[in-house]
């Protein structure tokens, strides 16, 4: 299927470009938008680090340093107690949802913070393992599910 074509392309492309390997994130439990471990293991990926239910898998092409999660991602916490969303534009719907949530928060006088991850440095220093969308409330990571106004309202009530 398409997954096989994509992973084989990624592996070949990375090797052709002289990369050290490829990493991906999986979960011990089935979660939305996260690949299945068995699929990647079939291509030689191995677990190299863990945070809670999440595992970092790597397919290394050489003997370079084994990838690890950054220390700041291990806590999955932030100092801010307001609802805070870290996001990037990996998904084409993200900006739409950010705009919808911004409008909803204004209309309902709710404090919500958006922190856009738009550089490698910001991604490396993110307070969790997700850099495409991460929801924090009262300082704690609560999910990586992209929210719209309706799902946000259910979460905060």
Model regions: which residues?
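Conserved acetyl-CoA-binding loop-helix of GNAT-fold acetyltransferases
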Residues: 1-14
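Conserved GNAT acetyl-CoA-binding A-motif
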Residues: 14-32
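Conserved catalytic-core motifs of GNAT/GCN5-like acyltransferases
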Residues: 25-26, 37, 41-58, 142
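C-terminal "cap" of GNAT-fold acetyltransferases
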Residues: 52-74
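Local sequence-structure signature of Cys/Sec-based thiol-disulfide redox active-site neighborhoods
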Residues: 73-107
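Thiol-based oxidoreductase modules, predominantly thioredoxin-like and allied folds used
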Residues: 110-122
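Structural micro-motif
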Residues: 127-136
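Non-catalytic, surface beta->alpha helical segment in thiol-disulfide oxidoreductase systems
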Residues: 138-157
């Amino acid at each position: 299927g398409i997954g096989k074509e994509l992973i084989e392309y990624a592996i070949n492309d990375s090797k052709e470009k002289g990369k050290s390997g490829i990493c991906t994130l999986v979960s011990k439990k089935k979660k939305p938008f996260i690949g299945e471990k068995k699929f990647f293991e079939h291509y030689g990926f191995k677990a190299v680090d863990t945070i809670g239910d999440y595992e970092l898998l790597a397919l290394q092409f050489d003997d370079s340093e084994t990838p690890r999660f950054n220390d700041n991602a291990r806590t999955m916490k932030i100092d801010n107690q307001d609802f805070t969303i870290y996001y990037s534009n990996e998904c084409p719907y993200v900006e739409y949802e950010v705009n919808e949530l911004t409008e909803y928060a204004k209309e309902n006088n709710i404090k919500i913070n958006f922190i856009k991850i738009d550089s490698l440095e910001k991604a490396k220093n993110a307070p969790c393992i997700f850099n495409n969308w991460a929801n924090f409330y009262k300082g704690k990571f609560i999910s990586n599910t992209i929210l719209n106004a309706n799902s946000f309202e259910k979460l905060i009530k």
